[in-house]
């Protein structure tokens, strides 16, 4: 998976700030992705635990079971540890105080799980709520939390990739080698709600982010209709249960229902949307009579150069930080490499740049097993001092190494740390291997020449055996070149569709390549490493009558082999076409589209505010998406830019809890034969 070929970006406004945490600051003891967890020498014992209240909407819930839980670390969906147990008061306050407890080793992030209780209409066995607290040993008797449907929504979307939902209960757990991924999942959820107040964070309260406040409140109102009822058979609870039943397994409470909504946000949306009360407990919420396209929860990052320039390529490092290349505006400025942490904090205000070659047009990027971020940079006539180059950045933003490379586009790194870059000339494209010699990268290795005029994405198969280059020839037609690094042979594949706009690729665990084909076929094709067409999956959405054209950009495979495809919806000028949001389509490992037919369309849910451009008239958080990546928490990241906006409207988008976690960076998955596997 690499970034796809994109157009140049226009100028817009820049915003900047560092978001604040709403929970107590986490003091994390994190394991490296793909490494054994860090062990603590002794357990930590607290004499008194946190306190708080449990509510259904704004009503206290009395007699509810309150459990302090530590996620399991023996496998995904493994049994959590119950650290402390109590019940809420029945005096009309719904309050609780946890007794003392001993933190597990290694010290972990913990959460509250609520079951049953009386919200005012009698005992309701369908009550299930949750709240993420933070690091076990940093909690104390002064920690106070409000648990309600909003904290439940945030917890469900964070924990869904690690959850097992059965008729016997809910289990949250990860593997011993992905404690980092589970810990990181707490951070974006922490930005969605205030756990001390039990309210959703306002849409623009955290600078550099646009939060899905209206969507969080809408989901909370749907759950509250069941919580504040007489039980599972009630007219507002039974439909929630039936509409969130997955594979014949019905949820036993509202927490399980929320987990299922997080994992299947495009399922039964109209039926669920209509469950909220006409006088709902949480506002502001979506008030339109028309339900949203789906119930994805996403955060739009628009700080610093992102809002102005948009994003192009994207990669996730071992810590779970997202690295994004931002192009320069058409003013002769310099582009930048941006870093976004799981908590939403940014790197330096202007991003990371290099003084030697300059950075104008970033195209591709990839992260090597040692954590160096390699970026393809192209020169520009507006910056005559810049030169085409491959630039390696250390995680602190300093330059590790840099050297000239002619018009580099796609970038991938294999398991040994060698860089593979596609290159574009006027007559042909090529891709080459830039070797790692004891940490010093030199420009002196394999070059494979192809016949197409536009190089594109580069993808590497398991154990670095195969390297794929996608050449998007536009009107000349596309071709895919396979280079076997063992036999040193080259094979050219002409897509079965005859497509002329194939820009993205990803390789699965079996070594098959998945191609994003945005031509008239409009779908995904899968080829074996012998060049045989295995599958072709069409994606709905082309509408030539209205001028709506799907341009599939890139795709990524999650830890269960599901494919996520980013789609830029092209609004052909002059034909009266409406405003179209960007799209994210999900296919399962068998190729069936499991997202809505037109894909997920993440939104903040806020009312339209006017403006110009494809996205500015809407509250969409997915702006003409391009590059795509999945992190160790199961979040899907996309770069994007609003090409036609007259004010800043571009985002890097994080869709929460939608995918299965993957090994990061991708080069480590290649090295360890863990592509499309969970860590």
Model-assigned labels for residue ranges:
Residues 34-312:
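Feature for extracytoplasmic/surface-facing segments of secreted or surface-associated proteins
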Residues 10, 24-26:
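Hydrophobic helical h-region of N-terminal Sec-dependent signal peptides
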Residues 26-27, 129:
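Residue-level signal for mature regions of secreted extracellular proteins and peptides
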Residues 29-32:
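C-terminal motif of bacterial Sec signal peptides marking the signal peptidase cleavage site
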Residues 22, 41, 55-57, 212, ...:
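Residues embedded in well-ordered secondary-structure elements
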Residues 269-679:
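Flexible "stalk/tail and boundary" regions
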Residues 16-23:
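Sec-dependent signal peptide recognition
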């Amino acid at each position: 998976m690499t970034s796809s070929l994109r157009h140049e970006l226009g100028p817009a406004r820049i915003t900047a700030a560092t978001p604040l945490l709403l929970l107590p600051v986490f003091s994390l003891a994190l394991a490296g992705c793909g490494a054994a967890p860090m062990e603590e020498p002794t357990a930590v014992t607290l004499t008194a635990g946190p306190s708080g209240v449990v509510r259904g909407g704004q009503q206290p819930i009395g007699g509810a079971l309150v459990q302090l839980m530590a996620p399991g670390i023996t496998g995904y969906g493994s049994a959590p540890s119950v650290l402390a147990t109590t019940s809420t008061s029945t005096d009309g306050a719904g309050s609780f105080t946890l007794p003392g407890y001993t933190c597990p080793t290694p010290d972990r992030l913990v959460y509250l799980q609520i079951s049953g209780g009386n919200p005012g209409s009698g005992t309701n066995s369908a009550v299930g709520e949750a709240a993420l607290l933070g690091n076990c040993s940093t909690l104390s008797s002064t920690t106070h939390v409000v648990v309600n449907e909003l904290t439940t929504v945030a917890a469900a979307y964070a924990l869904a990739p690690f959850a097992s939902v059965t008729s016997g209960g809910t289990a949250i757990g990860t593997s011993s080698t992905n404690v980092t991924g589970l810990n990181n999942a707490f951070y974006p959820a922490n930005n969605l709600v205030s756990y001390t107040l039990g309210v959703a964070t306002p849409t623009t309260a955290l600078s550099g982010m646009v939060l899905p406040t209206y969507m969080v409140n809408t989901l909370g109102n749907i759950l509250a209709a069941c919580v504040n009822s007489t039980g599972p058979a009630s007219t507002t609870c039974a439909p929630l249960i039936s509409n969130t039943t997955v594979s014949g397994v019905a949820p036993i409470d509202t927490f399980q229902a929320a987990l299922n909504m997080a994992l299947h946000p495009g399922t039964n949306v109209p039926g669920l949307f209509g469950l909220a009360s006409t006088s709902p407990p949480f506002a502001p919420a979506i008030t339109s009579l028309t339900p949203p396209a789906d119930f994805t929860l996403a955060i739009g990052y628009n700080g610093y150069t992102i809002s102005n320039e948009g994003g192009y390529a994207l990669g996730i490092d071992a810590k779970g930080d997202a690295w994004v290349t931002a192009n320069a505006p058409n003013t002769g400025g310099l582009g930048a490499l941006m870093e976004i942490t799981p908590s939403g904090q940014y790197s330096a205000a202007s991003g990371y740049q290099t003084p030697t070659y300059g950075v104008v047009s970033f195209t591709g990027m990839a992260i090597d097993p040692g954590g160096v971020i390699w970026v393809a940079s192209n020169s520009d006539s507006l910056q005559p001092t810049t030169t085409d180059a491959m630039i390696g950045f250390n995680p602190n933003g300093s330059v590790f190494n840099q050297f000239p490379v002619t018009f580099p586009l796609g970038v991938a790194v294999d398991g040994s740390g060698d860089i593979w870059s596609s290159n574009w000339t006027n007559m042909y494209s090529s891709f080459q291997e830039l070797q790692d010699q004891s940490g010093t990268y030199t420009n002196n290795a394999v070059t494979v020449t192809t016949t197409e005029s536009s190089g594109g994405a580069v993808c590497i198969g398991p154990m670095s055996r195969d390297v794929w280059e996608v050449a998007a020839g536009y009107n000349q037609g596309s071709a895919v070149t396979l280079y076997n690094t063992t036999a040193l042979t080259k094979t050219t594949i002409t897509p079965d569709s005859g497509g002329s706009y194939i820009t993205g690729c990803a390789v699965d665990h079996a070594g098959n390549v998945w191609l994003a084909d945005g031509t008239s076929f409009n779908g995904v094709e899968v080829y074996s490493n012998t060049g045989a067409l295995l599958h072709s999956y069409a994606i709905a959405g082309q509408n030539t009558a209205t001028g709506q054209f799907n341009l599939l950009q890139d795709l990524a495979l999650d830890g269960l082999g599901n494919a996520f495809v980013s789609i830029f919806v092209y609004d052909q000028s002059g034909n009266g076409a409406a405003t179209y949001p960007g799209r994210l389509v999900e296919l399962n490992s068998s190729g069936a589209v499991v997202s809505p037919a037109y894909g997920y369309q993440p939104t903040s849910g806020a009312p339209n505010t006017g403006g110009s451009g494809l996205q500015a008239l809407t509250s969409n958080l997915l702006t003409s998406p391009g590059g795509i990546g999945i992190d160790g928490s199961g979040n899907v990241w996309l770069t994007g830019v609003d090409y036609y906006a007259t004010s800043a409207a571009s985002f890097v988008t994080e869709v929460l809890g939608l995918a299965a976690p993957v090994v990061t960076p991708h080069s480590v998955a290649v090295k360890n034969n863990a592509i499309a596997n969970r860590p």
